[in-house]
Amino acid sequence: MPEANTFSDAGPDLWQCLGWQPNENQLSQLKELQALLRHWNSRVNLTRLVENEEFWIAQVFDSLWPLEKELRTPDLTRRCIDVGTGGGFPGLAVAIALPGTSLTLVDSVGRKTAAVESMANALGLGTRVDVRTERVEVTGQKRSCRGTFDLAMARAVATPPVVAEYLVPLLAHQGQALLYRGHWSNDDEANLKRALVPLKAKLADCKQINLPAGRGLRTLIRIESIAPCPKSYPRPVGLPNRLPLGNQADDKRS
């Protein structure tokens, strides 16, 4: 009888698939994160992905696999922002895996950011994790955030053109935006490329994997700036979602 996999309890199969192995302290932090998520989920509806494979694959693995390159240099100093962090993913998992990285986690729902901030402090990440309660259209126009991040990421937030408008203005020179997606089509790519034109950015890479244990297809889109993003982006709150770039007659404005 074949040996059962260990995807449900952070066993070696999980890390072998990921190509990264947490040290003892990091594994302890990830397990504590699961316990904290259980606690807060009983008070605030953060996520249903808390137990067994749903936590270790759909949360931890899915947060970290797009960072294959960054995981090779975990102590390198970086600034990273997680937009629409929700229950703290991918941001908190990234903070654990990349100890040299400072994280900004943004969400517009105060009860969620309160829970995420409490979890970050309990995990000993408070000095590296800054939690902001605001719309990302506001974040992207603030001097303290705009054009300052090496990595800007968003998982399951909105359509690709909308997410691109959220993330690109946050990027420092040579920074990259990471879009965590599921299925990806030629139409998705065409729409995104059109949206990137007024943002002065380009599609740098597209990578796909199947999550372990049949948990589904995932796509990583990396975007990089080719010139400073025009100050008119992101547009005011709500406009990126109502009038996505790539579908407008005035996309060529700068």
UniProtKB/Swiss-Prot annotation:
Q: Name one GO cellular component term.
A: cytosol
* UniProtKB keywords: Cytoplasm, Methyltransferase, rRNA processing, S-adenosyl-L-methionine, Transferase
Give a yes or no for keyword Transcription regulation in this entry: no
What's the main place this protein lives?
cytoplasm
UniProt EC number: 2.1.1.-
Enzyme group, top EC level? transferase
Q: Give the source's domain of life in one word.
A: Bacteria
Molecular function per GO: rRNA (guanine-N7-)-methyltransferase activity
Localisation per UniProt entry: Cytoplasm
Which InterPro entries does this one have?
rRNA_ssu_MeTfrase_G, SAM-dependent_MTases_sf
Q: Where does S-adenosyl-L-methionine bind?
A: 84, 89, 136-137, 155
**Function as written in the Swiss-Prot or TrEMBL entry:** Specifically methylates the N7 position of a guanine in 16S rRNA.
Which family, according to the similarity comment?
Belongs to the methyltransferase superfamily. RNA methyltransferase RsmG family.
Protein name in the entry: Ribosomal RNA small subunit methyltransferase G
Protein's organism: Synechococcus sp. (strain CC9311)
Instruction: Tell me what gene encodes this.
Output: rsmG
